[in-house]
From Swiss-Prot:
Source species, domain of life: Eukaryota
CDD domains in the cross-refs: DHQase_II
EC number of this enzyme: 4.2.1.10
Name used for this protein in its record: Catabolic 3-dehydroquinase
Alphabetic keyword roster: Lyase, Quinate metabolism
C-alpha cells in the first residue's frame, strides 16, 4: 500500500468555492485538502497538499517529491494541463506514478481544453466527477 501521496493543485484552484460555482461547485480547496488528508490518514498513509498559481513552483514541488519519498502524485494542473511541457517533463523526470484530476469534464468544454500534456503519461485521468474525483483518485492510489 502507498504510504506517501502528494496532492498538487494548480492555478486558480485556490478560488474554488467562489469561482464559477455552476461549474466547480461550492466546495473550497481547503475543504478538499482537509478531506484528502483525513482519507489518507484513515488508511495509515500520509497526504501532503500543495497549491500554486506559478508553473515553476509546481515544477519545483514535483522535484521535491522525489527527494521526500513520495510514492504517488495526484495533480489537478488546472490550465497548465493544456500548456505545460515543463510540468509534463518534471513528472516524467521524477518517475512517480500520477493521476490527472479535473473537476469538470474538460472534453465537453472549449476545444483548447481537450488537449492534455499529461494524460498520455498518467496512470489514470479522472474528469467530470466534481470534487468526488479527488476522493476516487485517493482511493485508487491508496490501494496500489
Amino acid at each position: 500500500m502507498v504510504k506517501k501521496i502528494l496532492l498538487i493543485n494548480g492555478p486558480n484552484l485556490n478560488s474554488l468555492g467562489t469561482r464559477e460555482p455552476e461549474k466547480y461547485g461550492t466546495t473550497t480547496l481547503k475543504d478538499i485538502e482537509q478531506a484528502a488528508i483525513e482519507q489518507a490518514k484513515a488508511k495509515g498513509s500520509e497526504m501532503a497538499v500543495y497549491q500554486n498559481n506559478t508553473e515553476g513552483f509546481i515544477v519545483d514541488r514535483i522535484h521535491e517529491a522525489k527527494k521526500q519519498g513520495v510514492e504517488y502524485i495526484l495533480i489537478n494542473a488546472g490550465a497548465y494541463t493544456h500548456t505545460s511541457v515543463a510540468i509534463r517533463d518534471a513528472l516524467s523526470a521524477v518517475a512517480i506514478p500520477f493521476i490527472e484530476i479535473h473537476i469538470t469534464n474538460v472534453h465537453s468544454r472549449e476545444e483548447f481544453r481537450h488537449k492534455s500534456y499529461l494524460s498520455d503519461t498518467a496512470v489514470a485521468v479522472i474528469c467530470g466527477l466534481g470534487v468526488y474525483g479527488y476522493t476516487a483518485a485517493i482511493d485508487f492510489a491508496l490501494n496500489k
